[in-house]
Amino acid sequence: MPAREVYLKRPATRRQLEGICTRYDGQQRITQLDCEEGCSKRTQPPQRLNPRYKSPDLIHISFIIVLLCILSMTSSVVAQTTTGSSSSKAAATPILPRQTLPTTISLPPLNISHPVLQLALPPTSSLYLTFSICSLTSNATILPTVLISTSSPASFNLGSKPIRDASTGGIPTSSGGKGYNYKSGRNGATWGLKWSSGFGNWTLNGTSETQVHLLLGLGLGNDGSTLNTTGVGNGNVVVQMGASTSGPLHALSAVYPLLGDTTSTSALIFSPLLYSSPQPEPSYPNYTLPGAQLAFPDFSYSEPLNSSLSSNLTLIVVPTNASPTSTDLGNSICAINAASANSSVSGANNTILKSFQPEWMTVGDEQGFRSYWVLGDLAEQGNYTAWVSDDKGVLSQPAWFATKPAGFPCQLVMPNDVCPNLGYSAPLDANSTAVTSPSGATISPTSPIQTLPDDLLELIVQNLEAFSTSLLSHACGRDLFSHVSSCLDCYSAYRDWLCRIVVPQCGAANSTSGATVIETATSTSTSSGTFPTPSTVLRTPSSPRNPSLPIPAYSYYELLPCMSTCNRADRSCPVSMGIRCPKRKVNAAKSYAFVGDDHSYGDGSAAQGVAAQDRWGNRWCNG
């Protein structure tokens, strides 16, 4: 079938919008879009035209309409000419007008009937392209090949020995990706896009204007001409492309949402650490420790963030069985948005509580600012996938969590000014304040506990004040105290230990069938496959953890504190403060969780090889 040429036609007047002129077998067909006058029917050679308008407000919308019309008309044409040379294909390639940049568009679908698409971008010295796979065919293993050329004429032959090219894009494995893009040799001008779970990117940073050509295909070989559509499957592959000359419109962050904890129908989720803000170290001679009730600093929007995410975040949560991660599209923002549109459990109808700006806390063993969300009306023992995205187009890595079984008795407790390390379920009386959605439906019959009960609060405050008074009698702020820690380190470690002992964390009933010691662990907690089994023990009103503390009115399984919480306080504080931790081979298993009998390994700290939580926030001990 002879190839068709598609190009933009220059208008006769500045007020006109260009027509799309198509020449096929020497006969020209003209499709007009809002032309004030008829388009000329003279045969015109293909050319790239810069549109002119009196009304700048219409430029962006008008050119997107033109581009989409061009692409929809040419996708089938290009697919039928894939056996031709690269140069001949480029001659009939539609050009994205410069005025549409920056823009995000969904390209015409690729399928068994139309497996190839080619287009060109306007000459530029700087270009940032991002790609997301919105959907796959019935054969989810077939990903579209994306070849990029800056040569003239375009050549899409990647060669038999392409090299990695980190300078143009791709996502390194250290950031949750699958590697960098490929390039056709050190001085080559052809690149192959490397997909990372449905996301890819490519960047041009040159010194002179260059025209960029793209060739996308299903079953397309790296030579840009071999096409094998066997096994492509039914349905469409849809790719969303973002193009800009000033910076990428979409990006991936290597960080994850952090799970606080779940109940049977609710979940507490924190953002990644946005801004690290350790407590300021006092100095001698005016060495003063923080009060029992901390004065939290305000979040400063002018401070540089520790995360590639901005502070304006949106939480996205969908059931895992409806998640694009099931087809390895967990980094595709358009696939995630489609799943969220159909199955979201993180919208207004599921939100019990959320922060309006980042707040200071010490969850995740890090001092600094995070945002949080509490979701309700979730399924019992449900599996969910979560992301956070920001207003700059940056997407986090996906995190997975599960809700507890029916009958789970404990309540979610939020970080507060006395115990900023909380953020989990605890055996406290329920806050019976019901939460309803904007439509009036009940999201949850209870609310998270934001202030501790008076008896627990008074107990913690009294202990902190007494400990502070005793600690300040030492040589705080002077070399005589310690070469490795300070009085503030000691006081902070004691606060962390005290809060976890007085406000224990609840665990699931089926964790270890009552066992309190984990015998083996072969890896750090960053590997979910070898993550230690949560260490829980049954607590009842008749056999509480500590009879001198307020006793819950119901039975629950306690997730034991990590041995590291006691060890940290022991190491940081003077011997005279009297902090002593139990021995592993003696009686430590009654009160603390650890791995093995070697005191130098597995206490729940990252320094000892098995951190308390994995990268998503799932814990095997409370620490």
Curated annotation (Swiss-Prot):
Localisation: Cell membrane
- Chief subcellular location equals membrane
Q: Name one GO cellular component term.
A: voltage-gated calcium channel complex
Loss of function: phenotype: Growth defect during endoplasmic reticulum stress induced by tunicamycin, fluconazole or ketoconazole. Sensitive to conditions of low calcium. Sensitive to oxidative stress induced by hydrogen peroxide during conditions of low calcium.
In this chain, the stretch annotated as Required for targeting to the cell membrane covers 600-623
Region Disordered, annotated ranges: 524-544
User: Does this entry carry the keyword Cell membrane?
Assistant: yes
Q: How does it sit in the membrane?
A: Single-pass type I membrane protein
Q: Topological domains (Extracellular): residue ranges?
A: 1-57
Assembly: Forms an oligomer by disulfide bonds. Interacts with CCH1 to form a Ca(2+) influx channel. Interacts (via C-terminus) with CCP1/cytochrome c peroxidase; the interaction may contribute to cellular detoxification of radicals.
Q: What does this chain do?
A: Calcium-permeable, cation-selective stretch-activated channel (SAC) that functions together with CCH1 to mediate calcium entry into cells. May additionally play a role in cellular detoxification of radicals.
Task: Please state what the protein is called.
Answer: Stretch-activated cation channel MID1
**Annotated organism of origin:** Cryptococcus neoformans var. grubii serotype A (strain H99 / ATCC 208821 / CBS 10515 / FGSC 9487)
Q: What is the lineage of its organism?
A: Eukaryota, Fungi, Dikarya, Basidiomycota, Agaricomycotina
Q: Which gene encodes it?
A: MID1
